[in-house]
Design a protein with these regions (language model features):
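Transmembrane helices of ABC transporter permease
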Residues: 11, 15-28, 39, 69, ...
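Hydrophobic/aromatic residues in alpha-helical transmembrane segments
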Residues: 33-37, 58, 74, 78, ...
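An intracellular "coupling" helix at the cytosolic face of ABC transporter transmembrane type-1 domains
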Residues: 11-13, 99-103, 119-132, 136, ...
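Short intracellular "coupling" helices and adjacent cytoplasmic loop segments at the cytosolic face
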Residues: 47, 83, 91-115, 119-121, ...
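ABC-type nucleotide-binding domain
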Residues: 327-610
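Helix-loop-helix
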Residues: 48-53, 62, 144, 148-162, ...
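Membrane-integrated ABC transporters
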Residues: 1-33, 37, 45-61, 74-78, ...
Length: 610
């Protein structure tokens, strides 16, 4: 995964190289300063020679100034490299996500992808900057300081080299303990983001049902989960610090003790002891910096794996080698089609991680999940075969969860079938260029989405170069023109995030108009008039008949009144087609359709009458 992620830093190879070079020059200046300090003490102060004090003092100031310049340049190049790396990663991830099918997105979840695009990439950015600065600085400082220590006093230097081994062991143990915890932390971030996203997008429903306390409890639990894991990880990192400080203080006492004896014995000068003390502290501080780098790498390794999973994910749906670039007509044919959603073992395993179980129980649980994953999957659609002629209006009705939305998703190839084939315009949908197919099969999904911007900007999602007249005509067909003209700025009215400043029915009509602007061969409305009154619903269908008679129209609805005048009606039940015919034919031959009709007309006849 590291190779997959790091290839996006290649564009910033030069600043990534220059930063360590300037860092090395800064370190070289800094590590020589204690050596000059010894000259000031021994050849200047102790020798009562102020000329040497000035000479070596000015040399020290010059070296400090150079160190500052080199350090600043190193920091600038490191910042450019790390932020550029993060920018490229975000671009690469976004481009990759755009290629994902619905199935790929289901695999990661929306909240999981948001966490990866924000928190995980920021972790990698910080780690990369630390690596090209501190990971270079610490070893160079350590090596040069060790050489200088041996040069000044090999006897005293040899006494503390064993300390390096102890610190290295502590750092290794820290990595082994904290890596698994940080992996869990970022999974909990996904759950936290999901909770926030769900609550904010449904805030009106939350308030309408007075569920604020329930949502707060759910959110607090997600926050507490992240808090507990972070405390667990941080406490283990902090626990190492007292041990390291104890080692450092012990080394200081040893230096003072043995250094004092060597000075008294005439084997060492005061200046040498001072510089030796500084160099030994440099070595110890370098070891601590290395430990910090290990911690940062530990945190970022989990992020690298999560980013790598997205970048290496193979899209389930791709363009064929020689795609068909034209959809000739709106004919649709389902040939013995079966489909099932992929079983996501990863999500179930993640849910199980919240439970405290012993190793044996965890292993048994994983084995059981794997067996379930290998077992035959429940089919959402099974053995569907039917023909729809170009220009026909098809109604689609059935109970909740019977596969209506899945059925229409296969037409625009949002998912691929498991068995059989779906044909549009006499070609298998797998033969088409994806953009070509989806431009000609316009879908208004069950969950309508509007984006921040003006009404015109939202409409032009359907056709980027649409004129104002084309937009108005589409809105007239969707019965949206009237309420748009009543808005203060008309078609230039700003749509707030998520379309929060328009009603559900208005949002649906805008989405229908957006789809109509594409002038598709096939128009699919997935329960897209559910928030529209029956009179407006009837006017929209009338506009379809008069303005787009050659377009194949598939209308999913829970209301018989919305589809009763369709050329044919599909009745679905638990993934199969239970009936296919006109309203009159189904009333005579299909008990399910007849029952739905009688329930609606007798139970709410006034509402459904046109």
């Amino acid at each position: 995964m590291f190779k997959v992620v790091l290839r996006h830093a290649k564009e910033y190879r030069l600043p990534s190289i220059l930063s360590p070079i300037f860092m090395a020059l800064e370190v070289l200046m800094q590590v020589l300063i204690p050596y000059i300090t010894a000259f000031i003490i021994d050849r200047g102060i102790s020798a009562n020679n102020m000329g040497n004090v000035y000479k070596y003092g000015l040399t020290m100031i010059g070296m400090a100034m150079l160190a500052m310049v080199f350090g600043s340049l190193s920091g600038i190049f490191a910042a450019k490299a790390s932020t550029g790396f993060a920018k490229n990663l975000r671009k690469a991830m976004y481009e990759k996500i755009q290629t994902f099918s619905f199935s790929n997105i289901d695999h990661f979840s929306t909240a999981g992808l948001v966490t990866r695009m924000t928190t995980d990439i920021t972790n990698i950015q910080n780690a990369y900057q630390m690596v090209i600065r501190i990971a270079i600085r610490a070893p160079i400082t350590m090596i040069v300081s060790v050489i200088m220590c041996i040069k000044i006093s090999a006897k005293i230097s040899g006494m503390f080299f064993g300390v390096l081994v102890i610190i290295a062991v502590l750092a290794g143990a820290l990595m082994a303990i904290t890596v698994p915890i940080f992996k869990k932390v970022f999974k909990k971030y996904d759950a936290l983001n999901a909770s926030v996203q769900e609550n904010l997008s449904g805030i009106r429903v939350v308030k309408a049902f007075v569920r604020e306390d329930f949502e707060k409890t759910k959110f607090y639990k997600a926050v507490d989960d992240v808090y507990r894991l972070f405390v667990k990880a941080e406490s283990r990192m902090v626990a190492m610090m007292p041990g390291m400080m104890l080692i450092i203080y012990t080394v200081i006492m040893m230096i003072c003790w043995f250094g004092a004896h060597y000075i008294v014995a005439g084997e060492m000068t005061t200046g040498n002891l001072t510089s030796l003390y500084t160099y030994i502290m440099n070595v110890l501080m370098s070891m601590m910096m290395v430990a910090m780098v290990f911690v940062m790498i530990t945190m970022s390794s989990a992020s690298v794996n999560r980013i790598g999973q997205v970048l290496t994910e193979e899209p389930d749906i791709e363009n064929p080698e020689n795609p068909v670039m034209v959809v000739p007509n709106g004919d649709i044919r389902f040939d013995n089609v079966s489909f099932s959603y992929k079983y996501d073992l990863a999500k179930i395993e993640e849910e199980e991680k919240n439970r405290k179980k012993g190793p044996m129980r965890r292993r048994k649980k994983t084995e059981a999940l794997e067996e379930k994953n290998d077992a035959p999957k429940a089919k959402t659609l099974e053995g569907i075969s039917l023909d729809i002629k170009s220009g026909e209006t098809i109604g689609l009705i059935g109970g909740t969860g019977c596969g209506k939305s899945t059925f229409v998703s296969l037409i625009s190839r949002l998912y691929d079938v498991d068995e059989g084939a779906v044909f549009v315009g006499d070609h298998n949908v797998k033969e088409y260029d994806l953009d070509t197919l989806r431009n000609e099969v316009s879908v208004v999904l069950q969950k309508n989405e509007l984006f921040t911007g003006t009404i015109l900007e939202n409409l032009r999602w359907g056709k980027e170069d649409a004129t104002l007249e084309e937009c108005i005509h589409a809105c007239e067909m969707a019965c949206a023109d009237e309420f748009i003209r009543n808005m203060p700025d008309g078609y230039n009215t700003k749509i707030e995030q998520g379309g929060s400043n328009v009603s559900g029915g208005q949002k649906q009509r805008l989405c229908i108009a957006r789809a109509l602007l594409k002038k598709p061969k096939v128009l699919i409305l997935d329960d897209s008039t559910s928030a529209v009154d029956t009179a407006t619903d009837a006017n929209i269908r009338k506009a379809f008949r008069e303005n787009i008679p050659g377009t194949t129209k598939i209308i999913i609805s829970q209301r018989i009144s919305s589809i009763s005048d369709a050329d044919k009606i599909i009745v679905m039940g638990r993934g199969t087609v239970e009936g296919f015919g006109t309203h009159d034919e189904l009333m005579q031959t299909n008990e399910i359709y007849k029952e739905i009709y009688e329930t609606q007309t007798k139970g709410s006849g006034d509402f459904d009458q046109q």
